[in-house]
């Protein structure tokens, strides 16, 4: 049986103003991952992801590549317990 996990992910680089959040949302839907993504005031992007471990890992790997016009310098991951409280993946503000 596959394990459900959660992850808090911080992405650094040229990740704001380059459609990173919208593309992350699209990728999350493709992987079946739920949660949210938002810009931070420090220029980074933060996401909270939940789903099957392999799907969350795939979305984290996607974040390392980013959207076509972004430049990802670093991806920091903090694994969390699966809460099950999300039903979709949203861009938040």
Protein language model regions, located:
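Intrinsically disordered, low-complexity, mixed-charge
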Residues: 1-93
